[in-house]
Amino acid sequence: MRTWWRVIFDKLLGKKGVSSPLDMESIFKGSGATALQAQAYRGYPASLPLDAGIGAYLVRFLVSEGCMERLTLALSQIGYLVLPELDTQVIERSGDHSGKKVMLFLHPSFAGTIVSFASDDLDVLEALQQTRLAPPLPADSFPWIDPEALGSLQGDVEYWWMNFWLPFWVSLNQEEQLALDLEPEWREFVAIHHPSALSSSAG
């Protein structure tokens, strides 16, 4: 039985039950990636649980336009040259003979870019976690929505909340949450759907 993240990456690869030139198992075969430090799961963006069958860790998050530029710069500084015009690419680390690589997928959505990647290089995750990446603000992702009129989370809003906004929000401390330029209505929305944010919104 395939896990949900494998289904997502299969869709990104364009698989339809047949082999693909971009096959994660083949690309990362023999990488030796077997464990991640605890920080890989605590930082932002966080890794999904490592799958020994793939030999790489998987990460998925949403970034704003400005943060996308910082992301490509951070990767270039450790030897990975990203071509933003390509939505799917496998990049080997420049000047490194160990065969470390990144398999990167870029998809425009929610007024930003959904970044999905697999890698056997822990330097990549560390670099991204130190870059302070952030998604677009809720009002930018959903300019047509009145948050005060929203009831339960559903559809695109639920998908955005569970997969992108909430993981980012909980990675912030209270001071960082208060510093975000959230409109009052969206701040209240966050507080309602994530109760621990109530103290942050009370400021």
At which residue positions do the language-model features occur?
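Polar/charged low-complexity regulatory segments
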Residues: 2-203
